[in-house]
Amino acid sequence: MTIFSIRSQIIIGVISSVILTTIILVIAYKLMWFNGHMTLTLAITTMITSCLTLSICSIFINPLIQKIKQFNIKTKQFINHEKFIDDETFQSPREIKELNDSFNKMAYEINNQMNMIKNEQQEKTEIIQNLAHDLKTPLAGIRSYSEGLRDGVISDPQEVHEAYEILIKQANRLSILFDDITHVINLNTGRSYPLELIQLDQLLVNILQPYEQHIKQENRTLEVNFCTDIDAFYQYRPPIERILTNLLDNALKFSNSGSRIDIIISECKENDVISISIKDEGIGIVPELQSRIFERTFRVEDSRNTKTGGSGLGLYIANELAQQIDASITVQSDLDIGTTMTLTLKKFQFKK
């Protein structure tokens, strides 16, 4: 179906009105409402008026048509992912200007969304590449020691015991890597958690109990300092446990055996917030890198992840979970002295 242009439709409309007016005048003449001279005068006047109307309409309609053509070109450029430049000096009716402004806003939002998607895809690709690289080391270790045990290459009882210990460590490392992958995938699923009444002492017992044997083996000192008068409060338990677990893992990984770790809990009643700090005596973080440690693809040092068995995603996961529960994580670190990570939580009021 052929669609006429705006200019053609206006011309057709004017011609149609002239023809219709002429027909009415002829009928009026036949019915003797007007004499011949008056009918001719009215017909000529109608034609002249119509021509003037058409000319005036053309003068006013041309800028509108040009703006629509420009808008059409800009739309095609946007579809073809070409950069378009909007002429702000070009005059147009209010409705067309509003349409143009709406289109520009839509294009801007779409471009932002597309850039965000591209960046996320790029980051996901980097994460997968990093994790694939991390998986090779424990898998290679498991394979080599398994083959050694199978073929009898490792036969001395002490060596066999050490081989089993290494296999267990590498299996645990794989478990940590897959656990990190699962948490990264779940971060953007919009998962919600119920508010729970949290007792700090019970929360710390649940978090620290799995580390008890590890802390003893490494001859570490773990001190917990908090006021006993801190009342129970409502918060989201699963994210908090995961955040503190990741922060504690980070403190253990990047500090030496025999060193001290402090967990300090304080309350600011004026702002209704709880602060939980985990302080280590580890290697520390240089100032220029402290603002980047929560990035998804950032690693302070690849060799350290190989040594500690981590994926480098622990702090990223912790920070993302903190944002989801309206909390925050801050870092204070001195190179070769230690690092303090502080989780600040709001105390929510339970609403039934």
Curated annotation (Swiss-Prot):
Which Pfam families does this chain map to? Answer: HATPase_c, HisKA
GO biological process: one example: cellular response to phosphate starvation
The Histidine kinase domain extends over 130-349
Query: Where is it found, in Gene Ontology cellular component terms?
Result: plasma membrane
Superkingdom of this entry's organism? Bacteria
List the catalysed reactions.
ATP + protein L-histidine = ADP + protein N-phospho-L-histidine
Principal localisation: membrane
**Residues that span the membrane, as ranges:** 9-29, 41-61
Q: Which UniProt keywords apply?
A: ATP-binding, Cell membrane, Kinase, Membrane, Nucleotide-binding, Phosphoprotein, Transferase, Transmembrane, Transmembrane helix, Two-component regulatory system
What EC numbers are recorded for this enzyme? 2.7.13.3
Question: Could you describe the post-translational modifications of this protein?
Answer: Autophosphorylated.
Residues with the modification Phosphohistidine, per the entry, are: H133
Which locations, inside or outside the cell, does it occupy?
A: Cell membrane
* Topological category with respect to the lipid bilayer: Multi-pass membrane protein
Q: Output the Gene Ontology terms for molecular function.
A: ATP binding; phosphoprotein phosphatase activity; phosphorelay sensor kinase activity
Q: Does the keyword Transmembrane apply?
A: yes
Q: What does this protein do?
A: Member of the two-component regulatory system SaeR/SaeS. Probably functions as a membrane-associated protein kinase that upon sensing the appropriate signal, autophosphorylates and in turn activates the cytosolic response regulator SaeR.
Can you say what this protein is called?
Answer: Histidine protein kinase SaeS
Q: Which organism is it from?
A: Staphylococcus epidermidis (strain ATCC 35984 / DSM 28319 / BCRC 17069 / CCUG 31568 / BM 3577 / RP62A)
